[in-house]
Swiss-Prot record:
Keywords: Coiled coil. Residues 58-151, 161-182 form a coiled coil. This is Protein LiaH. The gene is liaH. The keyword Coiled coil applies. Disulfide bonds: none annotated. InterPro entries: PspA_VIPP1. The keyword Plastid does not apply. Belongs to the PspA/Vipp/IM30 family.
Length: 225
């Protein structure tokens, strides 16, 4: 028991340094192995206790049997007029009856302890089966909880508004690049005067496009909310 407590304290101290339920499958498998080891030891103890109980029972039965023989011998000796021989047989009978009583008491005690051990073993085996039945479900629940926690942490790190604003900024930049490219192409066919002539109109159209783009952005954000 002392060694087991030391081991449990050591295991507990190690687990405190680990992430909580970092690997539930490993922990549950270890728990199952520990229970199986305890059950194996309990079975060995039961075998030994059964042997002890059997030995006491055998000694009790042998002593009682010999005591019975000595009683018969004493009666025969007494009937034959051999009183001293009868006394000797009776003395041995009394001694054997005392030993038989001792062995019987030891047998009953050992047998009672054996029954308790068998009851404890049955309880352990029931618990082990219960753990095995629930193990996979517990592992699945732990994995699901861990995955959900990981996803929540990931989502917390992402600023969705910031990401969306970055998307709009890139979109506007691409639009400006397209406009500059188209403007440059048309400039090759026109003159500087023509560019100045339509500059205000072009700027007005650009402003309309920007306004429309912002309206679309606001509508999209409102729909997402």
């Amino acid at each position: 028991m002392v060694l087991k407590r030391i081991r449990d304290m050591f295991v507990a101290s190690v687990h405190e340094g680990l992430d909580k339920m970092e690997n539930p499958k490993v922990m549950l498998n270890q728990y199952v192995r520990d229970m199986e080891s305890d059950i194996a030891k309990a079975k060995q103890t039961i075998v030994k206790q059964h042997t002890i109980a059997y030995q006491f029972k055998k000694k009790y039965e042998e002593a009682a049997e010999v005591a019975g023989k000595r009683k018969n011998q004493a009666q025969l000796a007494f009937d034959a007029g051999e009183e001293e021989l009868a006394k000797k047989a009776l003395t041995e009978m009394k001694y054997l009856e005392g030993k038989a009583a001792e062995h019987k008491a030891s047998y009953e005690q050992a047998n009672s302890q054996l029954a308790d051990l068998k009851e404890q073993l049955a309880a352990l085996e029931t618990k082990l089966q219960d753990v095995k039945d629930k193990k996979q479900a517990l592992i699945a629940r732990a994995n699901a909880a861990k995955a959900k926690e990981h996803m929540n942490t990931t989502f917390d790190k992402i600023d969705s508004e910031s990401a969306y604003r970055e998307f709009l900024r890139i979109e506007n930049r691409i639009e400006e690049m397209e406009i500059r490219a188209n403007y440059s192409k048309s400039a090759e066919a026109g003159t500087e005067l023509t560019r100045k002539e339509f500059a205000d109109d072009v700027e007005a159209e650009i402003e309309k496009m920007r306004t429309l783009s912002l309206q679309k952005s606001d509508q999209t954000k409102a729909a997402n909310e």
